[in-house]
Amino acid sequence: MTEGVGLPLWLLAELTYRCLLQCPYCSNPLDYAQHKNELTTQEWFDVFDQARQMGAVQLGFSGGEPLVRQDLEQLVAHAHQLGFYTNLVTSGMGLTEQRISHLKQAGLDHIQISFQASDPVLNDALAGSKHAFEQKYEMCRLVKKYDYPMVLNFVIHRHNIDQIDKIIELCLELNADTVELAICQFYGWAFLNRQGLLPTQEQLIRAERITNEYREKLKAQNHPCKLIFVVPDYYEERPKACMNGWGKIFFTVAPDGMALPCHAARQLPISFPNVREQSLSRIWYESTGFNRFRGDAWMPEGCRSCPDKDRDFGGCRCQAYMLTGDASNADPVCGKSPYHQFIEQARAESEIDSSLEKLVFRNSRNSKQFTVQQNIPVQNIVDD
């Protein structure tokens, strides 16, 4: 065991990149369409077995849309038998009462459903799918019926942030226990669409104020609903402790078996191992990919001598790569970073008007076009 390396307590199983929606802020890789060789049911069983033996306690099922996998109930049952706390992150598309019942029987602990907006028309436009809002709404009712905690997630951006009060009202109508109002994090398709998604600072201040007003109102009513407001680091002056540090507690397995220290790391010019070829233990403790940004030896001067390095762990490596071209550079979010001007530029661009029509939607046709053209901007196509 490598000295000083902790346990991979949190396993994220990205079961598939397939999805019924086309959200333009999806964090999946732009070239996801070329990654089709998904792990089999038995291969996922083996991943869960190894992770549990290593000390993992929480298992998240995500995608893409994990409900596309017809073996999801089997995977949940196996994870439950191993003693994992299991969480399903879903759009609600493909969910039915029968599947909710089967997932309950399999031992699933937690379901988180995402919405795009409180307004059905805007919700479906952002999802690139007709009747998505109607399906999500009905599934929320059923999730509550089967005694799951009602956890709702809204990715907040410039096109829905001004609905923040209506979003919260919708969540209360659905008897949500927890609501995550997460300002868009700019990875994958969201980074491609950043100019059209990043809210202005004025929008952000207003949304946070309204959220705080609702918190006070709910507290006065002794209402159990918890509102979580996640500010984008693009409006911070200090970087986030991304994943609580590279290779510290978080282990992601992509649909094709690639092992990653975070779900966005696939884009980095690093050769990450595959669970089909190496054990999880070897990957976690010995692989170059997982050791690359552990500790502080990799940090540039300025970061290495910073008193905050043990709190933010140097910030986000993927963000440094996307904005500067080098994952070893100081996170541009940091006000001390020599690359902070990239963040200031993004803030300035948020003041430019942008319509939904300018967004590039996440679907196979756009992904294939991007893959062929590499870094050439793709023509926006919305699948019918």
Curated annotation (Swiss-Prot):
InterPro entries: 4Fe4S-binding_SPASM_dom, Aldolase_TIM, Elp3/MiaA/NifB-like_rSAM, PQQ_synth_PqqE_bac, PqqE-like, Radical_SAM_PqqE_MftC-like, rSAM. It is an enzyme of class 1 (oxidoreductase). Pathway: Cofactor biosynthesis; pyrroloquinoline quinone biosynthesis. Its EC number is 1.21.98.4. SMART domains: Elp3. Residues 5-220 form the Radical SAM core domain. Binds 1 [4Fe-4S] cluster. The cluster is coordinated with 3 cysteines and an exchangeable S-adenosyl-L-methionine. Keywords: 4Fe-4S, Iron, Iron-sulfur, Metal-binding, Oxidoreductase, PQQ biosynthesis, S-adenosyl-L-methionine. It catalyses: [PQQ precursor protein] + S-adenosyl-L-methionine = E-Y cross-linked-[PQQ precursor protein] + 5'-deoxyadenosine + L-methionine + H(+). One of its GO terms (biological process) is pyrroloquinoline quinone biosynthetic process. Coiled coil: none annotated. [4Fe-4S] cluster binds at residues 19, 23, 26. One of its GO terms (molecular function) is S-adenosyl-L-methionine binding. Its cofactor is [4Fe-4S] cluster. Transmembrane segments: none annotated. PANTHER family: PQQA PEPTIDE CYCLASE, RADICAL SAM DOMAIN PROTEIN. Belongs to the radical SAM superfamily. PqqE family. Catalyzes the cross-linking of a glutamate residue and a tyrosine residue in the PqqA protein as part of the biosynthesis of pyrroloquinoline quinone (PQQ). Interacts with PqqD. The interaction is necessary for activity of PqqE. This is PqqA peptide cyclase. It comes from Acinetobacter baumannii (strain SDF). The gene is pqqE.
